[in-house]
Amino acid sequence: MGILSRLTGATQKTNVEAQYAPQVLGEYSPYAMPFQFAYVGRTEALGVPALARCRNLLAGTIGTIPLMLHKKSTGEMLGSPLWLDQPSYHQPRSVTIAYTVDSLLFYGQAFWQVVEVYQEDGRPSRFEWIANSRVTATLDRDNVFVKSYAIDGTTVPMDGLGSLITFQSLNDGILNTGTSTIRAALDVQKASVVAAATPMATGYLKNTGADLPPSEVQGLLSAWKSARQNRSTAYLTSTLNYESVGFSPKDMMYNEAIQNLATEIARLCNVPPYYVSADQNTTMTYANVTEERKQFLTLSLQPFISAIEDRLSMDDITARGNVVLFDIDKNYLRTDPLVELAVIREMIDLQLITVEQAMGMTDLTPNGSHGMIYE
C-alpha cells in the first residue's frame, strides 16, 4: 500500500476518529450501568416536582449560555464555526445543549450523532442529539470498553459520518445512583394524592343509650352534617358522644416526608436545597446575586459545563490548539456595565490593554475576527 502510494503520488487522507472505544465508567452490573435502563425512568422521575425543578435549573441555565471558540495558548476569541451556533438542524443551540445536560444528569452520558463532516479534515460540521433510550452498546469481553453502538437496533460506525460523539458526565446518572430516593419521593407523593382523593372519616357519633332505628340514625347524621356547615360548635345529648378518628396530613407526616425528600433530591442533583424551597434549608446568610450565581456555577453547573467543553475541545471535533468554552463571563456572570467600564478604564490607564482591545471587550469593535462565521 505504501509502495503504491509512492508510485502514484497519492496521499492518504487523515481519518479523525470520534473518541474510539469509550470506556465504561463506574461500577459495571447488568442492572446499574450507564448503558442499561434504570429502575426508575426519566419521565417517571420528572413527576417529582423537586427533581423537575433541579433539572430545569441545571439544563435551562447552561442551555442559555453561548459557546465560543478560543485559541488555547492566548485565550483569543476566534470565529465560531456554524455548528457552535446551531449544532443540529432540528432545533436551536439552547435546546440541544439543554437536553445534553439532561442526558448527563439522568444517565451519566449523552450522545450526538455526526450527520455532516468537513471535506477538508473529516471533522464533524453538524450533529443530531440522540436520546439515551435509543442507544445500546456492545462491550468487549471484559466489559471495560465499548466495541460498537447501535441506534434503534442499527449498528453505527465508530468514527466519521454517522458515528456517535459521547459526552461522559463527571458523576453517575441519578437514575442509577438515586433510584431509591426517587422511588421514595414518588411513593410519598402517591400516598398523599390517594389520601386527598379518598378522605377518611374524621369521626363518628357514639350512642350510649338505646339503639335508634335506621331512619333516625340517618336523620341525626344529616342534621349533624348540616349544622357543621353552618357553625363549628355542636350540642350533644347525654346519650351521644363524638369520637375523633381522622388523621390530618400533618399527623400522617406527608408534609415532613415531602420536604425531607425534596432536600435529598436536591443533594442528589448537587443543587442547593433552598433552590427547591425545602423548609429545613431556608436559613442562609445574606449573599448578593453575583456571589450566589458564582456559588451555583462552581458547585452545580461547572461539572456539566466542563464535561461538554472538554468533549467539544477534543481533537476529533476541534483543531488542536483551539478550545470550545461557554461564554460565562459575558452572560451568566455579566456584571453591571458601569462596573465593567470602570475596570476597563483602569486597564487602559495602566496600559494593560489598548483602546481597540477595550472596544473588543465590550463588543464595540467593527474589526477583528469576532462575529465572523466560518463555513
Predicted regions and their residues:
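Aromatic side chains
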Residues: 147-149, 286, 296
